[in-house]
Regions:
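Basic helix-turn-helix/winged-helix DNA-binding cores
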Residues: 3-114
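Amphipathic, well-ordered alpha-helical segments in soluble domains
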Residues: 43, 47, 69, 144, ...
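Residue-level recognition of alpha-helical structural elements
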Residues: 62, 112, 134, 163-167
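Amphipathic alpha-helical dimerization/coiled-coil segments
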Residues: 103-150
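Acidic interhelical loop/turn segments
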Residues: 153-171
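Hydrophobic alpha-helical segments that form the core
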Residues: 169-181
């Protein structure tokens, strides 16, 4: 499948079909939910917790995104609703059509990374900050990335222990990201 995937990405790029909504008809958030539902039926809250546990180090999702996507996936027949549980919580299960759609999504070109770093954006306008603002910004970012790095290192270690090489690899991306951010912060100017 690997060679076929690369060929399909190249063909899609050459034809100009890689933009906006994927050919599978699902966006990355919907695809992430379908992927998580391969683990078994889950309520919206359980999906949010699973996304936080498994994906948050490298892919963010908000509660509103999760709850907005679930009815859309149900309307498309990609998930089915289970019986309501306590406090009207409703489990969702992936359907055969959902599994096929997810497989198509996996084979598509993932597109380009979207880089949106709020610290880099503020540093870009560093000449408009006071020196104390820049130092405070850098200190807060250092603290965040140091704590996040420790967390994702532990998650990657646990994934390797459990034999989940794919999850461990994705978590290593987050480890590398936080290391790079900390390295960059050391060289970022802190006075205007």
């Amino acid at each position: 499948m690997g060679g076929e995937t690369v060929k399909s990405w190249t063909a899609a790029r050459q034809s100009g079909s890689v933009r906006g909504m994927a050919e599978s008809g699902v966006n990355p958030t919907a695809a992430a939910l379908l992927g998580l539902l391969h683990e078994g039926p889950m309520t919206g809250g359980q999906l949010m917790a699973a996304a936080e546990r498994r994906l948050a180090p490298y892919w963010s999702m908000t509660r509103s995104q999760v709850y907005r996507e679930l009815p859309v996936l149900a309307d498309k027949g990609l998930v089915r609703l289970g019986k309501p549980g306590p406090r009207m919580s409703q489990p969702y299960a992936i359907t055969a059509a959902g599994k096929r759609t997810f497989s198509r999504w996996l084979a598509e070109d993932p597109g380009r990374d979207t880089i949106r770093n709020p610290i880099a954006l503020r540093i870009a306008f560093g000449q408009l900050h006071s020196a104390s603002q820049l130092k405070s910004l850098q200190a807060a970012a250092n603290e965040y990335h140091t704590e996040a790095l420790a967390r994702v290192r532990e998650q990657a270690k646990n994934a390797r222990k459990e034999g989940d090489t794919y999850d461990a690899s994705a978590l290593e991306f987050a480890v590398a990201y936080h290391k790079a951010a900390l390295s960059w912060l050391k060289s970022a100017p802190v006075s205007s």
